[in-house]
Amino acid sequence: EEAMALLRRVGLEDKAEEYPRKLSGGQKQRLAIVRALAMQPEVMLFDEPTSALDPEMVKEVLNVITDLTRSGMTILIVTHEMAFAREVSDRVLFICDGVIKEEGSPDQIFTCPHDPSTIKFLSMVL
């Protein structure tokens, strides 16, 4: 019952009887999120959750993560999806070569970055 509720939450209820090999990359990623949610975590970490997905699958995974943030769950995301990071974040850290170069609100980082590496990166991706 709990598993079905979690599958429903990520839009996979109709795939409950499917074998993993029959699922798309985005569906497998959402299923991984279901497995993590089954542990009832207080915090979830996503490390480039869309990097291995086809472009058409990216949105479905980002929608699930957005829903989790709206439900109040604390989430740490390592991502190059800057528009997404800006939309869902309360706080943004820009890390370059393992060093935190800049930290602030999405507005601070995306509209008025100070560090040259942040400025350069954002000019290339936005």
PLM region spans:
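Helical segment within the ABC ATPase nucleotide-binding domain
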Residues: K59-S71
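A short, surface-exposed alpha-helical micro-motif characterized by mixed small hydrophobic
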Residues: A85-E87
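ABC ATPase "signature
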Residues: E103-G104
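Catalytic Walker B motif of ABC-type/P-loop ATPase nucleotide-binding domains
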Residues: M44-D47
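H-loop/switch region of ABC-family ATPase nucleotide-binding domains
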Residues: T79-H80
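Conserved signature/switch motifs of ABC ATPase nucleotide-binding domains
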Residues: E18-R21, M39, S71
